[in-house]
A protein has these predicted regions:
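Non-catalytic alpha-helical scaffolds and adjoining flexible linkers that form interface surfaces
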Residues: 1-203
Length: 203
């Protein structure tokens, strides 16, 4: 079987059938950022995978029930869907994603900086860490943002979550990260979940 994070569309064996809705306890497994053990086969039309057998590797109750965590999960899930183009078998990336999801699930303190922390680790795993001297290369980060990035990488996860940042700072940081990723991937990145994320952290 294969164990992985839900990033792209997948349907139970047989696909959608009129009059045969998926049972609630089955569909609940397939929320954004669910981590499952599964046996998959390629669909006839390619792209869409069919799940023959699947079960949750972890139960993630707080991500499902807490609005802040579920919004962060939705943002990360959409980001991965639009930017993660690596072939299967990247164990290092998988371990990073699994660890990040479990940290989000188990966090009991402040998490307003979680998506910033995640973006640092994610871009690093993709091969273009947002640190160092870029010289004449495209750099969307301001000097103040670079100070925050460096500090966040030098402290623990718990300390990074407590790092003081204004709402506007977080929003600007995300925008800078998306421009940075667009430059390195060569693709435009438009996330529908970004507006919801900003609204959640408005207060």
């Amino acid at each position: 079987g294969r164990v992985g994070t839900i990033l792209r569309g997948a349907v139970p064996n047989g696909g959608k059938r009129r009059g045969s809705p998926i049972k609630g306890n089955s569909i609940s497994i397939l929320h954004p950022l669910s981590i499952i053990s599964a046996q998959c086969t390629s669909g006839r039309k390619g792209g869409l995978e069919i799940l023959k057998e699947y079960s949750p590797k972890y139960i993630l109750p707080s991500i499902r029930s807490e609005i802040t965590k579920s919004t962060i999960a939705l943002f990360i899930s959409e980001l991965l869907y639009r930017t993660l183009l690596l072939p299967e078998g990247d164990e290092s990336m998988y371990q990073f994603l699994e660890n990040a999801i479990l940290l989000l699930e188990r966090s009991e303190g402040p998490i307003a900086n979680f998506h910033i922390w995640f973006l640092i680790g994610y871009t690093t795993k993709l091969g273009f860490a947002p640190l160092g001297d870029f010289g004449s290369e495209f750099d969307p980060f301001s000097a103040k943002q670079r100070e925050v990035l460096k500090k966040m990488t030098d402290i623990s996860f718990i300390e990074a979550m407590k790092l003081p940042m204004e709402r506007e700072q977080r929003g600007e940081m995300i925008e800078s990260f998306l421009k940075y990723m667009e430059f390195h991937t060569g693709n435009r990145i438009r996330l529908n979940s970004l507006a919801v994320l900003k609204e959640i952290f408005k207060n």
